[in-house]
Design a protein with these regions (language model features):
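Catalytic-core segments of class I nucleotidyltransferases/pyrophosphorylases
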Residues: 150-174
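Conserved alpha/beta core of the MobA/IspD/sugar-nucleotide pyrophosphorylase nucleotidyltransferase superfamily
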Residues: 4, 8-24, 166-174
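Nucleotide and nucleotide-moiety/phosphate-recognizing core
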Residues: 18-155
Length: 174
């Protein structure tokens, strides 16, 4: 399929503009080295670990959700153990975010049309942020990547990827 750059810099293509079956992946597999010895995802926010706060926030959206976690046993597993989302650890996560991303994309069910990437350490994200991103996808359905913007117009999260981008994830590193 022919691809071109849109006026906003997103890669666009023709085809299946109406199909929308997203999967959210919450990235929580990192080592949290910069905060050592503390694990920032286990720090309390409103009386519960930040990771649990984020997972519950994402569950409000009613989209299938996967949380990528460090290998068990790890306290992060306990923080989300009773929540109705898929919890998984990928060996590739030892490589960093790119390894987790490669593994998660390869693990997506074939029915998933879009991947929504969410970092677990963004407590200010709210369901309205996802609603706006998904509406942006509807309005600009011929794009392949949709990225949220911060209030000052800088790229932010969450980010949404069309399935046509999934093969490229197999090549990422770093």
């Amino acid at each position: 399929q022919a691809r071109r750059r849109s006026a906003v810099g997103a890669v666009v293509r023709a085809g299946d503009a109406r199909s929308f079956a997203p999967q959210i992946v919450v990235w929580a597999a990192g080592a949290s080295r910069r905060m050592a010895p503390d694990d920032k995802l286990m720090l309390p926010l409103q009386g519960r670990p930040l990771l649990r706060h984020m997972a519950k926030r994402v569950l409000e959206i009613s989209v299938p959700t996967l949380v990528a976690l460090p290998p068990e046993p790890h306290p992060r597993w306990h923080a989300v153990k009773d929540l109705p989302l898929r919890k998984i650890s990928y060996p590739e996560s030892a490589e960093g975010l790119s390894g987790t991303l490669r593994a998660a994309v390869a693990d997506l069910p074939p029915t998933v049309t879009h991947l929504c990437v969410v970092l677990a350490d963004l407590p200010e994200l709210a369901p309205v942020d996802f609603a706006q991103l998904f509406e942006h996808r509807r309005q600009y359905a011929d794009c392949l990547i949709w990225r949220s913007l911060s209030p000052n117009g800088k790229p932010a999260h969450p980010t949404l990827f069309h399935r046509d981008t999934f093969p490229a994830f197999a090549q990422i590193s770093g």
